[in-house]
């Protein structure tokens, strides 16, 4: 086999941070001059997370080729330089759909279709296809769910078979939780022992056990885990809870020397690891002594911390080159004191979303920021809110609206895109990377410093082309359009400190090592506004 595979499973509890671990391992392996590919296998029966409630699943991350995926792929992107595509994700829903389609087409020649071998063979095909497409030195495969879940069994069986076929080219990492009982003042290893027993009963013996814990594990505890879980003591690693930032994870794993162990196990020769640049970025990110800036997030799903994961992370990325310390203030659009909360912020971000709930609150936030010259950034639905507010209060169209909110509006300044009226919701939006031509002399041009960019999209609605001329006559600047059909991509409010809306999702391209330019300029504008307010108060 031309590539090596690392399979990452989780046990004891969910939300262990497998995605962050996989992303951090990718960073460490890339620093060894190895090409890494990544694959997330999700056991749920949905075909993809595109139609799932953000409160249940969190953010939907979109790849360049237009695939709606799990938010863990966002972690992969932000930590490493791996290329992500439709080959980087698979769900049980996709697997079963493929198997049943083949059965209907007669490809199994009348055989009884079963989980083994037909479903497991399809899972193995997914693993092989990812490697064939991306051609990595090492493929990291994260298996969603927790050992013991019935949904994960076909994936684990496929991994067992794959390991049997390629025993020298595969390695299994099992991530577990090691709890600390405060009353007894003891660290308990029994849950880890049982989780490994479950995994071994399926036929997979882990090569590495990565223990998540509140505090560092002693040598004695590691020795006990080694003894009862049948792994060498030097193959038991510790991932303690991170106190400052998720971006400390690669530094923590590097300190544990886990990448050296993995490389030796897979037949590579480790090189000295230099993470000084990453360390500097983390220190800058966590520096609380910098200028304090408050950003209000006026969003629909703020109760779920993962619903806007990429937006949150992009703001923090931008705080490093902007040299400030961010405080993110969640503001419910339905709040009675919405405007009072906004008045205490240095900038406002209105993220994407769907549906009528909270729409008018976003309109109010946009108006407040426009009239009071507060930096404001609208993304996707947020941009549409900026345009509708402008039409209502500057064009004097009080009934202007989006057709998503009110299909009967007399002034549909935001309308459904042509061909988007399908009753099938999954995977039918305008998805993936499209070009955007930037207008010279605009805020966007100052940020991008180029006249053509590629950005990722996920939407059905657009600024109504029949209203664009009137909007421009009243001062709204169309700062970016898609050359493929002249779709409005970026709008800017004139004579304003910094107010910009984008139809795309710039948060999907931001990294700690390469923050997105629009987020940088937004945070810089908010910082300047914060300093201006502080100077005014001290006069």
Curated annotation (Swiss-Prot):
NCBIfam families: PRK05380.1, PyrG. Homotetramer. Catalyzes the ATP-dependent amination of UTP to CTP with either L-glutamine or ammonia as the source of nitrogen. May be involved in lipopolysaccharide biosynthesis, potentially channelling CTP directly to CMP-KDO synthetase. Regulates intracellular CTP levels through interactions with the four ribonucleotide triphosphates. UTP binds at residues 14, 188-193, 224. The active site is at 380 (nucleophile), 505, 507. Mg(2+) binds at residues 72, 142. GO terms for cellular component: cytosol. Residues 294-532 form the Glutamine amidotransferase type-1 domain. CTPSs have evolved a hybrid strategy for distinguishing between UTP and CTP. The overlapping regions of the product feedback inhibitory and substrate sites recognize a common feature in both compounds, the triphosphate moiety. To differentiate isosteric substrate and product pyrimidine rings, an additional pocket far from the expected kinase/ligase catalytic site, specifically recognizes the cytosine and ribose portions of the product inhibitor. Pfam families: CTP_synth_N (PF06418), GATase (PF00117). This is CTP synthase. GO terms for molecular function: ATP binding; CTP synthase activity; glutaminase activity; identical protein binding; metal ion binding. It catalyses: UTP + L-glutamine + ATP + H2O = CTP + L-glutamate + ADP + phosphate + 2 H(+); L-glutamine + H2O = L-glutamate + NH4(+); UTP + NH4(+) + ATP = CTP + ADP + phosphate + 2 H(+). Changing residue 405 to M: In strain: L2. ATP binds at residues 15-20, 72, 242. GO terms for biological process: 'de novo' CTP biosynthetic process; CTP biosynthetic process; pyrimidine nucleobase biosynthetic process. InterPro entries: Class_I_gatase-like, CTP_synthase, CTP_synthase_N, GATASE, GATase1_CTP_Synthase, P-loop_NTPase. Residues 1-268 are annotated as: Amidoligase domain.
């Amino acid at each position: 086999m031309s590539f090596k595979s690392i399979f990452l499973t989780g046990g004891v509890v969910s939300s262990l941070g497998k995605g962050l671990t996989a992303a951090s391992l990718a960073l460490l392996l890339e620093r060894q001059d190895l090409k890494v590919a990544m694959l997330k296998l999700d056991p749920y029966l949905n075909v993809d997370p595109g139609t799932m409630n953000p409160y249940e699943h969190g953010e939907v991350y979109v790849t360049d080729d237009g695939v709606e995926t799990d938010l863990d792929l966002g972690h992969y992107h932000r930590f490493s330089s791996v290329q992500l595509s439709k080959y980087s994700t698979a769900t049980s829903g996709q697997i079963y759909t493929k198997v049943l389609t083949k059965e209907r087409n007669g490809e199994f020649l009348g055989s009884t279709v079963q989980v083994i071998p037909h479903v497991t063979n399809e899972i193995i095909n997914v693993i092989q296809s990812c490697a064939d497409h991306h051609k990595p030195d090492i493929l990291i495969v994260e298996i969603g769910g927790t050992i013991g879940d019935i949904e994960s069994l076909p994936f684990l069986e496929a991994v067992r078979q794959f390991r049997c076929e390629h025993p020298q080219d595969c390695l299994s990492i099992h991530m577990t939780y090691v709890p600390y009982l405060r009353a007894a003042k003891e660290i308990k290893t029994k849950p880890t022992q049982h989780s490994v027993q479950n995994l071994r009963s399926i036929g997979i013996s882990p090569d590495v056990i990565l223990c998540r814990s509140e505090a560092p594990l002693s040598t004695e505890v590691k020795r006990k885990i080694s003894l009862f879980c049948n792994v060498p003591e030097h193959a038991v690693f510790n991932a303690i809870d991170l106190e400052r930032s998720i971006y400390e994870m690669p530094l923590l794993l590097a300190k544990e020397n886990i990448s050296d162990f993995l490389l030796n196990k897979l037949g590579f020769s480790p090189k000295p690891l230099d993470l000084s640049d990453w360390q500097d970025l983390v220190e800058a990110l966590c520096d609380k002594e910098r200028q304090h800036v408050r950003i209000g997030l006026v969003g629909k799903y703020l109760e779920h911390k993962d619903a806007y994961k990429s937006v949150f992370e992009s703001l923090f990325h931008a705080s490093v080159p902007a040299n400030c310390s961010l405080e993110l203030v969640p503001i419910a659009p339905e709040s009675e004191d919405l405007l009072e909360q906004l008045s205490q912020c240095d900038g406002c971000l209105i993220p994407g979303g769907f549906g009528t709930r909270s729409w008018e609150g976003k309109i109010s936030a946009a108006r407040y920021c426009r009239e009071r010259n507060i930096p404001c950034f609208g993304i996707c639905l947020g941009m549409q809110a900026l345009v509708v507010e402008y039409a209502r209060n500057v064009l004097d169209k009080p009934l202007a609206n989006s057709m998503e909110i009110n299909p009967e509006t007399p002034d549909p300044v935001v309308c459904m895109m042509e061909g988007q009226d399908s009753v099938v919701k999954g995977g039918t939006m305008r998805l993936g990377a499209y070009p955007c031509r930037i207008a010279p002399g605009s805020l966007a041009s100052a940020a991008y410093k180029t006249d053509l960019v590629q950005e990722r999209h996920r939407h059905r609605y657009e600024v109504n082309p029949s209203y664009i001329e009137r909007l421009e006559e009243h001062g709204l600047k169309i700062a970016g359009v898609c050359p493929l059909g002249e779709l409005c991509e970026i709008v800017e409010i004139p004579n304003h400190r910094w107010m910009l809306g984008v139809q795309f999702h710039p948060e999907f391209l931001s990294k700690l090592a390469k923050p997105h330019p629009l987020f940088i300029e937004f945070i810089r504008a908010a910082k300047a506004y914060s300093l201006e307010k502080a100077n005014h108060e001290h006069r």
